[in-house]
Amino acid sequence: MTNMRKSHPLAKIINESLIDLPAPSNISAWWNFGSLLGICLILQILTGLFLAMHYTADTTTAFSSVTHICRDVNYGWIIRYMHANGASMFFICLFIHVGRGMYYGSYTFSETWNIGILLLFAAMATAFMGYVLPWGQMSFWGATVITNLLSAIPYIGTNLVEWVWGGFSVDKATLTRFFAFHFILPFIISALAAVHLLFLHETGSNNPSGMVSDSDKIPFHPYYTIKDILGLLLLILVLMLLVLFSPDLLGDPDNYTPANPLSTPPHIKPEWYFLFAYAILRSIPNKLGGVLALVLSILILAVIPLLHTSKQRSMMFRPLSQCLFWLLTADLLTLTWIGGQPVEHPFMTMGQLASILYFSILLILMPISGTIENRLLKW
């Protein structure tokens, strides 16, 4: 008689995804972040659900309802801070996951990669709308500034902004719809993640060498379940250190002031994980140009598979491309730092240079280095 996990229709899906899944024998800890993202998503949905039970999506009571969660609800403070810092952990895992895909050439699985880009956009939209919900100063002004970017779209821009706002300014209608979207999007992300995995399991996982590893596969359980549990423990450790010791480290103090449309904060900036894109947006003086650069800074990921010129898939044995990859990493960290600085002399120039470097590495230097490395192979 066959094992139930192999014959039962539902158990069979779980079995083929988590237990008997053939996995390459040499995948490193960088392959841990996919499962960590799944766990982060589950954590965010659960904590978000409990927050939604006490939150009120109304401009007059939103701020005080968040205060009520922290002060009066049993363990409300820990749920709130786990949700806020869980988002930061989510994006740390996301950026590492995308970086690993770029480094080891996982983008050659085009369907998996493109759905991954959709997932990234969905996660960014969810996080942005979640940041608006506490209705603090930075929530209100962040929402005003970012939604206003739509007005840069020629002809339909102004109508589009008012349509998104549900009025002539960010107000009750905006908050209510943002809450509705913030609630539904994580479930859409879950569905997209399932499709992401479906396409991944069609081809099988990539590995550090970038070569086909069909002849050397091992079952996912127990080898990688144990390996993933180590990553999970480290993730929980870092998250709980943040939550219990410095829950506001990655937040903005302005968000502890209730939203006031009559007073603008000195520096309007989004959460830290959007600062790199925000710096690219600010580095272009033209509004429409800035918005295009902002969208392209993420959408550029879709072009990476088309610009792959190397005969080798992975960067493991490509020193030139490795140098460019780590230069890109340093550039993104620089952009993140600049995004949090005021729009003043040295930062503006640095932001423009860092933005040019970002696009140059991905669009020009990476393909050139791949071609040079192909030539070097013939020597």
Swiss-Prot record:
GO cellular component: mitochondrial inner membrane; respiratory chain complex III
Binding site for heme b b562: H83, H182
Record's bilayer topology term: Multi-pass membrane protein
Binding site for a ubiquinone: H201
CDD domains: cytochrome_b_C, Cytochrome_b_N
Cofactor binding, note field: Binds 2 heme b groups non-covalently.
Subcellular location: Mitochondrion inner membrane
GO biological processes: mitochondrial electron transport, ubiquinol to cytochrome c
Gene Ontology molecular function: metal ion binding; ubiquinol-cytochrome-c reductase activity
Quaternary structure annotation from Swiss-Prot or TrEMBL: The cytochrome bc1 complex contains 11 subunits: 3 respiratory subunits (MT-CYB, CYC1 and UQCRFS1), 2 core proteins (UQCRC1 and UQCRC2) and 6 low-molecular weight proteins (UQCRH/QCR6, UQCRB/QCR7, UQCRQ/QCR8, UQCR10/QCR9, UQCR11/QCR10 and a cleavage product of UQCRFS1). This cytochrome bc1 complex then forms a dimer.
Additional note from the record: Heme 1 (or BL or b562) is low-potential and absorbs at about 562 nm, and heme 2 (or BH or b566) is high-potential and absorbs at about 566 nm.
Free-text function comment from the UniProt entry: Component of the ubiquinol-cytochrome c reductase complex (complex III or cytochrome b-c1 complex) that is part of the mitochondrial respiratory chain. The b-c1 complex mediates electron transfer from ubiquinol to cytochrome c. Contributes to the generation of a proton gradient across the mitochondrial membrane that is then used for ATP synthesis.
Name listed for the protein in its UniProt record: Cytochrome b
Species name: Civettictis civetta (African civet)
GN (gene name): MT-CYB
